[in-house]
Amino acid sequence: MRHVLGIDAGGTKTRALLAAEDGRVVADASGGGANLRTHGELAVEKVLHAVAEETSAAAGVRPDAVALGIAGAGRPGDAAVLREILRRIGFRDRVVVTNDAHIAFVAGSPRRVGLALVCGTGSIAWGRNAGGEVARAGGFGWHVGDEGSGFWIGERAIRQVLRGRDGRGPATALEAALLAHFAIADPEDIVHEIYGGDFPRHRIAFFAVPVAEAARAGDAVASRILADAASELVLAAETVIRRLGLAGAAYDVVLSGGTFRALPALEADVARRLSAPDAAVRHLEGEPAAGAVELAREALRAAAP
């Protein structure tokens, strides 16, 4: 029996599933975040090597094919680096490197027509039509993109607290939430935290949860941030729908990502706004890594004599 490895590498955590050729999972492992742009090549290699070794040790087998879903894989330069990382840790043949939305799409869309909208630390929309054409929107990283993501929500909340602090914006309950979440005494201390050294961006992304709590309690500033996040996510999805000509035929919309899981009201708002007669909008119940397993199985079958 041959085996395959599927890896979902996110900005906050990494999941790996080792499965038999028939798709039955025989081992799994979790690791830290793995993103070339924010963690660096060596850190990504360390995480991928660790989860691969852990699954192989648990099952007592080595995979015959591997598929990696990770942010940034759509850029040719990053994809080449990722393939080299996989080669260094022992995977030279039957290797698939793709973006994180692709594996979520495969995991959640049996017909493989439609799109995945991922909202985690970052965000991206990626889809495929019946003719095999693919399109994406967003996913350009936290400096210039990732609109609507956990980081985007957290960063805007911090901005609004500081604006309210110096009189450029309204007072907001987010100020107290900021102090508690980051364990600081004064809102301006967050500036020193962020610029003072290696400040993990996932800490800002995790601030999205207190933002949602403030919105539920009626804070207008927090509510506006979440409404804007939903609009950005819907825009990304609708852009992919338009570019692929999906409207008018049955298609899936797969919602995935840690921020969607942590902020169900945000996910529900996005799902409502993307509802259409032709669209089957669903939350991804399983793991995106299961989509990577399926892509690895396909690579294994394609290489069979």
Q: Which residues does each predicted region cover?
A:
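Phosphate-binding/catalytic loop of phosphoryl-transfer enzymes
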Residues: A73-A171, A303
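ATP-binding/phosphotransfer module of carbohydrate and carboxylate kinases, centering on a glycine-rich
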Residues: M1-D64, I85-R88, A107-V113, I158-P305
